[in-house]
Amino acid sequence: MEQKNTADFVKSLSPSLKDELTSPSDYHLIDDVSPTVALSPLSTEQISESLSKASEYDLKVCPIGGATRLAIGNKPTQYDVALTLNKLDKVIDCKPSDLSITVQAGITLGKLQKQLQKNNQFLPISAPLAQRSTIGGILAIG
């Protein structure tokens, strides 16, 4: 496969996803490795587009939630795209009588607990920095 660069990747994104481009910052650093591009998608469709285009351009992607535990696991030698999921922070469905809730990956544990508290419920897990730790990150790390 021909090696393509991140500039071509950015040009190929839909206008709505280009609006979610940000400059990489210290927030995106993983053990001193910084991406070239940072994206903050607003929907699962935008995540799908991001990953599809990144694959097409042979780019390495790292998902980032609350960025609370990025140093855990194998250190990347490089990555091209930071896929920041903290804008995906909605409750999709809540059925208190069934004790079930469906949420997006970027919702923080703190925000989820506040939502559940409205019905005198809670999620029986804890995580450091609950106001920043996302459900997606907590589940990924364990």
Question: What name fits each language-model region?
Answer:
Residues 1-34, 53-61, 66-68:
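N-terminal accessory segments
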Residues 64-72, 126-136:
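Short, glycine/charge-rich beta-strand/loop segments that flank catalytic centers
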Residues 109, 138-142:
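Extended, low-hydrophobicity, polar/charged segments
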Residues 73-75, 104, 140-141:
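Short beta-strand-to-turn element immediately C-terminal to the catalytic PLP-Schiff-base lysine
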Residues 78-85:
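Short basic, glycine-rich beta-strand/loop surfaces that mediate nucleic-acid
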Residues 30, 71-77:
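Short glycine-biased active-site loop of nucleotidyltransferases that positions the nucleotide triphosphate
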Residues 29-61, 85-131:
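N-terminal glycine-rich flavin-associated loop
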